Amino acid sequence: MVWDWHLLALGVVTGILSGLLGIGGGVVMVPVLVGLGFSRHQSNAISLATILLVALAGLVGFAVSDAVDFPVGLVMGAGGVVGATVGAKWAYKLSGVALARVFGLLLLVVGIRMLWGGETTGSVSIDVPWSLLLAMGIGVGVGVLSGLTGVGGGVVMVPAMVFLLGMGQHLAEGTSLLAILFTAGAGTRVNLGNRLVQWQPVLLLALTGVVAAGIAALYAQQIPADTLARTFAVWLLLVAGRTLWKARPSEAKPSENR
C-alpha cells in the first residue's frame, strides 16, 4: 500500500514516545492515521491494538530499570478495564466529529497541565484503602477516555500518578505502561467485536514501534523528565488546536457522522 512506509515511520515515533514518556502513543497515531485516510473509528481501533504491543515492549525496558510499581499499575489497570470497555462501546455510537472533539479536548487539557508542570502532592501509600480507591478511580476514568479516543491513557495516567499519588516522573511512566496494557486490551476486545481492527496497519506499526519502545525505555531515565514532558506538551497543544479547528461546526461533513 502507498502508506506502508508512513506506518513504519509512525511506529518508530510512537515507540520512542512510549518508551521515553510512558504513554501508549495514541495521541500521535490517531491524528496521523486519520490523515492517511482511515476513519476516526478505524484509527481509534488500530491505535489501541498497536498500543497493546508497543506498551508491552516499553514496560519490559522500565521493569529492567526497576521503574515499575506493580501494585499500583495492577489496581489502576483493573479500573481501566471497566472504563475502557464502557468507553469503546460509547465510541461506536458516537459520530466521527464528536470523537474528534473529545480527543481534541483531552489533548488540550493534558497539554496545558504538562506544560504548567508543578510539584507532586507528596507520597501516598497504595496500602491505604482510600488510595487504593483513588488509583482504581483514576483507572476507570482513564479507561473511559481510552476507549473513546483510541489513546492508551498514559497522557492522563502519568500526570495523575505524579500529582495525585506523589510518584516520581520515571516511576509513573513505567507504571503507566503496565496499566495501559489493561486499558488497551479491554478497548481492543470491544473493537474486535465491532470489526473495527485492521491487522495489517497494526502489524506494520508494531514492527518498528516495539523495537523503538524497548530501546527508548532503556535510555528514558538518562534524560531530564521536565524537558521531555514540556516539549511533548507543546506538541499536544498544537495537535489539540488542529483537531478542534477541523472539528468545528463549519468544517463538519456529513460523511464524518460515522
Regions found by a protein language model. Give the residues of each.
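Proline-centered helix-kink/hinge sites
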Residues: V30-P31, L53, V158-P159, F182, ...
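Membrane-embedded alpha-helical segments of transport systems
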Residues: A49-A57, L178-G185, V211-A212
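Transmembrane helix boundary and interhelical junction motifs in multipass membrane proteins
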Residues: L21-V30, L148-A160
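N-terminal signal-anchor/start-transfer transmembrane helix
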Residues: L8-G19, V27-V28, A186
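Juxtamembrane transmembrane-helix boundary motif
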Residues: M1-T14, V34-L36, R40-Q42, V60-L148, ...
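Short hydrophobic/aromatic, small-residue-rich stretches within specific transmembrane helices
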Residues: S47-I51, G73, G77, S176-I180, ...
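Acidic (E/D-rich), amphipathic helical modules within compact regulatory domains
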Residues: I23, V30, G35, R40-Q42, ...
